[in-house]
UniProtKB/Swiss-Prot annotation:
The gene is metN. The keyword ATP-binding applies. This is Methionine import ATP-binding protein MetN. Its main location: membrane. It comes from Nocardia farcinica (strain IFM 10152). It catalyses: L-methionine(out) + ATP + H2O = L-methionine(in) + ADP + phosphate + H(+); D-methionine(out) + ATP + H2O = D-methionine(in) + ADP + phosphate + H(+). GO terms for molecular function: ABC-type D-methionine transporter activity; ATP binding; ATP hydrolysis activity. It is found in: Cell membrane. SUPFAM superfamilies: ACT-like, P-loop containing nucleoside triphosphate hydrolases. It is a peripheral membrane protein. Part of the ABC transporter complex MetNIQ involved in methionine import. Responsible for energy coupling to the transport system. Belongs to the ABC transporter superfamily. Methionine importer (TC 3.A.1.24) family. Keywords: Amino-acid transport, ATP-binding, Cell membrane, Membrane, Nucleotide-binding, Translocase, Transport.
Length: 334
């Protein structure tokens, strides 16, 4: 089914049972992952992120609901069918999961051996993948001879070996330093752009979402509390969990204690306004100047994401009450 999404969850719940105790990890998840997109799934520890990934590749079975991959059900079908579908899904792990006794080339070749590829074809594919991830010179190196970033690139190449249509990256950069994280994320974007692979990025880091995701699903207590474009979630988060994640990386709105400090420092009225490509503050500040209202930018920041601008600015407005009210009205009308 060419028009089917890459993955679709319909009212999916997952309950783990230990003796007589039950723990619901995911609650009635409805989620459609489009072909060719990078979807970020973010949440704190215990939110259900990894369970969601394991449901996609059939390593866990849902307690209720249905899951389809590329239009094909993976629930209520024989295990042999699930294994067949799993061949079209690549997996990247946080701890690399490389065979220490195999070289970089040997690790990449392993799934091709399992799939029954002939030797000559395997060797050609391994060489192609090593070049793609920039590790041609490390073909004969063992994992202990590689840096963390190089190990993860081997893991990515291995995940791509059989040309899957879907790639699951579960905390793939959590064990890496910031510079190496950037390199791995750039590689994921390259895979998506050049190979057309759909990617699901599981993470607890909003910087990762900002760097690669087209859309983001925010998980909290086993529920999707927000699902929107990455820009929309950053520019105007609707849920408290999304706002908390955005605040960890942007810092463009003063926290309550910072707002109290600013209030003590400035005699004017403090107001925080959101700005973006369509909502500037130039006209409102012109109104302020003409009305004799003094203004000062005391906090804030502006960012660019997906070729669009957004941010928040906190102003101190000082002047006659009616003039300040006129400026506030102008800001509200933007």
């Amino acid at each position: 089914m060419s028009d089917a999404p890459a993955v679709e969850f319909r009212s999916v719940s997952k309950v783990f049972r230990t003796g007589k105790r039950e723990h619901t990890v995911l609650h009635e998840i409805d989620l459609r992952i489009e072909r060719g997109e990078i979807l970020g799934v973010i949440g704190y520890s215990g939110a259900g992120k990894s369970t969601l990934a394991r449901l996609i590749n059939g390593l866990e079975k849902p307690t209720a609901g249905t899951i389809e991959v590329a239009g094909t059900p993976i629930t209520g079908v024989p295990e042999a069918r699930v294994r067949q579908l799993r061949r079209d899904i690549g997996m990247i792990f946080q701890q690399f999961n490389l065979f220490r006794s195999r070289t970089a080339a040997g690790n990449i070749e392993y799934p091709l051996k399992v799939a029954g590829w002939p030797r000559a074809k395997r060797k050609a594919r391994v060489a192609e993948l090593l070049e793609f991830v920039g590790l041609t010179d490390k073909a004969r190196s063992y994992p202990d001879q590689l840096s963390g970033g190089q190990k993860q690139r081997v893991g990515i190449a291995r995940a791509l070996a059989t040309s899957p249509a879907l790639l699951l990256a579960d905390e793939a950069t959590s064990a890496l330093d910031p510079e190496t994280t950037g390199e791995v994320l750039a590689l994921l974007r390259k895979i998506n752009t050049e190979l057309g692979v759909t990617i699901v990025v599981i993470t607890h880091e909003m910087d990762v979402i900002r760097a690669v995701a087209d859309r983001v699903a925010v998980l909290a207590d086993g529920r999707i509390v927000e699902l929107a474009s990455t820009f929309d979630v950053f520019a105007a988060p609707r849920s408290a969990p999304a706002r908390a994640f955005v605040d960890t990386v942007l810092h463009n709105r003063p926290a309550p204690e910072e707002l109290r400090r600013l209030d003590a420092l400035h005699t004017g009225r403090l107001v925080t306004v959101d700005v973006d490509d369509k909502r500037g503050i130039g006209a409102a500040l012109t109104t302020a100047a003409r009305a004799g209202v003094r203004f000062e930018v005391v906090y804030g920041g502006v960012s660019t994401l997906q070729d669009k601008t957004f941010g928040s600015i906190t102003l101190a407005l000082d002047g006659p009450d009616d003039a300040v009210a006129a400026v506030l009205a102008a800001l509200d009308e933007r």
